[in-house]
């Protein structure tokens, strides 16, 4: 890692894929090691999580190192629970994830405001108005939201054929109109 980054002024390390918090000790070791090894450089960390298993210890640790945390939350309960279930028991995820979001916001409000983001997935044919309304009604600004458009033909993101591209353009236009309403 050092050899690869020795000539850059800033090092960015990302944790994502599956659920990175399942191996929190490894994440903590990487952050501790990297901040010591690169003490003369700026080191930034970011992570994408489903938000279901974050603990108070993790929240405080990530706040200490200003980890940019992106939580996969699709919006209100009826949207989140439609496709996001716990693998082990098939139960819905919204209540657990949303309670953890509120815990993060209350426990580390400054870090939450500056470093916590949301990554909702929007299915084909859906206009994300309910998702935006949910976030807005919970005092989450649109600049903290990064929407992903899912492709139901598989697990891939949008395939760029004419039909899907037009759906994507239409959805983005509707979203812009929605966000610019008074």
Roles of regions detected by a PLM:
Residues 5-10, 38-43, 110-115, 141:
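Short helix-terminating capping/connector loops at secondary-structure junctions
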Residues 78-98, 102-182:
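Radical SAM enzyme [4Fe-4S]-AdoMet core and its adjacent flexible, acidic
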Residues 2-6, 69:
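Aromatic-lined, polymer-binding surfaces characteristic
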Residues 2-3, 35, 102-105:
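Generic structural signal for well-ordered alpha-helical scaffold segments
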Residues 8-20:
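Active-site groove signature of glycoside hydrolases
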């Amino acid at each position: 890692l050092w050899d690869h980054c020795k000539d850059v002024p800033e090092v960015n390390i990302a944790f994502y894929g599956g659920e990175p918090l399942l191996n929190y000790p490894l994440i903590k070791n990487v952050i501790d090691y990297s901040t010591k090894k690169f003490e003369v450089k700026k080191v930034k960390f970011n992570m994408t999580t489903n938000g279901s298993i974050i603990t108070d210890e993790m929240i405080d640790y990530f706040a200490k190192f200003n980890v940019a945390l992106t939580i996969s939350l699709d919006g209100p309960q009826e949207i989140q629970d439609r496709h996001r279930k716990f693998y082990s028991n098939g139960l819905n995820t919204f209540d657990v994830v949303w309670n953890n979001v509120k815990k993060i916001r209350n426990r580390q409000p400054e870090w939450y405001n500056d470093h916590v983001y949301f990554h909702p997935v929007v299915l084909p044919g859906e206009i994300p108005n309910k998702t935006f309304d949910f976030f807005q009604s919970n005092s989450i600004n649109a600049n903290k939201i990064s929407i992903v458009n899912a492709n139901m033909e598989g697990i891939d993101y949008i395939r760029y054929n004419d039909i899907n591209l037009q759906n994507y353009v239409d959805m983005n236009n509707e979203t812009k109109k929605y966000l610019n309403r008074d």
